[in-house]
Amino acid sequence: MADGPAYALQVAVIARLRADTDLGAVVGPKIFDEPPPSQYADYPFVHLGRLDDEAVRIGCHTDDDILFTIECHTRPVAGRVEVLALAHAVRRALDDAPLTLSGHSLDWCDFLTQSVNQSRDGATWTAVLAFEASVAAAV
């Protein structure tokens, strides 16, 4: 069975982030497709958040517009400085990136927006970056 467009995009996004040396310099190998259980969380880390897929019918074929988020989590002494650096590295790695998807082709991947906030615990900072990608079936 062939992978669906959302899964193919997930695999490509995680691979791109893991290959990024700027991001790796801050988080090392802690780039996940889902968040680690809280008892095992080793800050800082990055993970895929939401993944919303919408079919877009164009003539006789269908593309998928996929909205997805990447979440950056940190507990630095310096406050939001580290989470902003992580967010910037994620944005640079994915905005207009030439991602290679198995069984599909990427029309585009664009950064949309980001939100940064401090958790109620007063120690954890989170940045959530939103992207949109258009994925078509490989021809």
Spell out what each predicted region is.
Residues 1-60, 97-102:
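Small/polar-rich, solvent-exposed N-terminal microdomains that initiate assembly or binding
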Residues 53-56, 75, 117:
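Short beta-turn/strand-loop junction motif enriched in small, turn-promoting residues
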Residues 57-63, 119-124:
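Short, solvent-exposed beta-strand/turn "edge" segments of beta-rich domains on protein surfaces
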